[in-house]
Amino acid sequence: MSSGTLYDKVWDLHRVADLPGGSTQLFVGLHLIHEVTSPQAFAALQDKGLPVRCPERTVATVDHIVPTISQKRPFADPLAEEMLSTLERNCANYGIVLCGLGSGRQGIVHVIAPELGLTQPGMTVACGDSHTSTHGAFGAIAFGIGTSQVRDVLASQSLAMNKLKVRRIWVDGQLGSGVYAKDLILHVIRSLGVKAGVGYAYEFAGPAIDVLSMEERMTLCNMAIEGGARCGYVNPDGVTFDYLQGRFYAPTGEALHRAVAWWRSLASDPNAVFDDEVTFDAASIAPMVTWGITPGQGIAVDESVPTADSLEPSERPISEEACRYMDLEPGMAIEGVPVDVCFIGSCTNGRLSDLKAAAAIAKGRHVAQGIKAFVVPGSEQVARAAEAEGLDGVFRKAGFEWREPGCSMCLAMNPDRLEGRQISASSSNRNFKGRQGSSRGRTLLMSPAMVAAAAITGQVTDVRKLISNTVPSKSFHQ
């Protein structure tokens, strides 16, 4: 009887050769590229006169540097315009599909690949971006790579990799009202630490994971990297297969039936042996907010900033540093902390279900005075679907700005930036110093619904209080 994990099975299927020193040459089934980490890689190929080995397995988009208020060309930023033009030239020269602006398929790379059906169970997926682990939601092994490795994949369609250990994160029960996958992963990272996953792949499993939608699973896997794991994944199941059916690049007809049969066989076997296992109770998890300068510095919205005596000695220096930077006092409640900017979007939480959750809070309410709040769909497809359901109107009526797709304020590579000491409520994935533009800017990570609640009240607010006062509506057009 087979007794392997999904990670073991996918690794073995993609092994090309065992290399000196213990690493493995691993075939890459899908290579995703964007405008920031690909120019130098293409330049290296050109210097050596090398072709792209498998252009049909490479797909490009533009996301990091694009403005979200107006995407009219040429961009006001000449560097951003040059980066996009370079990507367009490279894709044309090497025969690579580019999901460009206005194509109907452009968006954040980790949003468009799943929605187009490019990401499928059993694949190895590589991209020059930290949050490539997103694609593990499909039962793929997906990892972020650096520019030199982007070059290697373009040239050889393979990478030299060291095999990881596998930690199973089992989650019992179900998440409560107002608690989302974002809260679950922030709770996991808080509990295990930002370095606990080093050398590991995280397998997310258990009753609470089984009932998550694909978009929620993507949020979960997206932030596995923030816990130190090289990748995170969920075993493929009926939820996965239903999501893929009808997607542009997904198999159809008899090919789909054969694919599903094979995809099912990839799941970790019941008697699979893991290197480590950790169990969580979903029902005990509350809406989360980060208070510090790492994603591991998170607390439930009804908790207080940790005091020194509640922390391990090794945690105290960075906690003190975080409090100084964030202008927070140990022991103070996180609920009620005022915010300046509220951002809903990113590869973590810029999908349709994320926008729906936030719109449900915004509907019939209005952004607090003095708060800048904006919504950035993760892709052109997400934007059009949201507009078809009337979500853009809900947000605009509530005082939010409705933007064009892109990475936006997740990182400081485009015009969407914090200024000075502004503090943001953000549905993105990193709260490092200066991450959102200003070298002195501050970031509070939370779910899209929590961001919407902060926008409405002007401060960190337990979204469950607003949910209890929300009248259910079947349509956002009402």
UniProtKB/Swiss-Prot annotation:
<dbReference type="InterPro" id="IPR001030">
    <property type="entry name" value="Acoase/IPM_deHydtase_lsu_aba"/>
</dbReference>
<comment type="function">
    <text>Catalyzes the isomerization between 2-isopropylmalate and 3-isopropylmalate, via the formation of 2-isopropylmaleate.</text>
</comment>
<feature type="binding site">
    <location>
        <position position="410"/>
    </location>
    <ligand>
        <name>[4Fe-4S] cluster</name>
    </ligand>
</feature>
<comment type="pathway">
    <text>Amino-acid biosynthesis; L-leucine biosynthesis; L-leucine from 3-methyl-2-oxobutanoate: step 2/4.</text>
</comment>
<keyword id="KW-0408">Iron</keyword>
<keyword id="KW-0456">Lyase</keyword>
<keyword id="KW-0432">Leucine biosynthesis</keyword>
<keyword id="KW-0028">Amino-acid biosynthesis</keyword>
<dbReference type="InterPro" id="IPR036008">
    <property type="entry name" value="Aconitase_4Fe-4S_dom"/>
</dbReference>
<dbReference type="InterPro" id="IPR018136">
    <property type="entry name" value="Aconitase_4Fe-4S_BS"/>
</dbReference>
<dbReference type="InterPro" id="IPR015931">
    <property type="entry name" value="Acnase/IPM_dHydase_lsu_aba_1/3"/>
</dbReference>
<comment type="similarity">
    <text>Belongs to the aconitase/IPM isomerase family. LeuC type 1 subfamily.</text>
</comment>
<feature type="binding site">
    <location>
        <position position="407"/>
    </location>
    <ligand>
        <name>[4Fe-4S] cluster</name>
    </ligand>
</feature>
<dbReference type="GO" id="GO:0051539">
    <property type="term" value="F:4 iron, 4 sulfur cluster binding"/>
</dbReference>
<dbReference type="InterPro" id="IPR004430">
    <property type="entry name" value="3-IsopropMal_deHydase_lsu"/>
</dbReference>
<comment type="subunit">
    <text>Heterodimer of LeuC and LeuD.</text>
</comment>
<dbReference type="GO" id="GO:0003861">
    <property type="term" value="F:3-isopropylmalate dehydratase activity"/>
</dbReference>
<dbReference type="GO" id="GO:0046872">
    <property type="term" value="F:metal ion binding"/>
</dbReference>
<keyword id="KW-0411">Iron-sulfur</keyword>
<protein>
    <recommendedName>
        <fullName>3-isopropylmalate dehydratase large subunit</fullName>
        <ecNumber>4.2.1.33</ecNumber>
    </recommendedName>
</protein>
<keyword id="KW-0004">4Fe-4S</keyword>
<dbReference type="Pfam" id="PF00330">
    <property type="entry name" value="Aconitase"/>
</dbReference>
<dbReference type="InterPro" id="IPR033941">
    <property type="entry name" value="IPMI_cat"/>
</dbReference>
<feature type="binding site">
    <location>
        <position position="347"/>
    </location>
    <ligand>
        <name>[4Fe-4S] cluster</name>
    </ligand>
</feature>
<dbReference type="GO" id="GO:0009098">
    <property type="term" value="P:L-leucine biosynthetic process"/>
</dbReference>
<keyword id="KW-0100">Branched-chain amino acid biosynthesis</keyword>
<keyword id="KW-0479">Metal-binding</keyword>
<dbReference type="InterPro" id="IPR050067">
    <property type="entry name" value="IPM_dehydratase_rel_enz"/>
</dbReference>
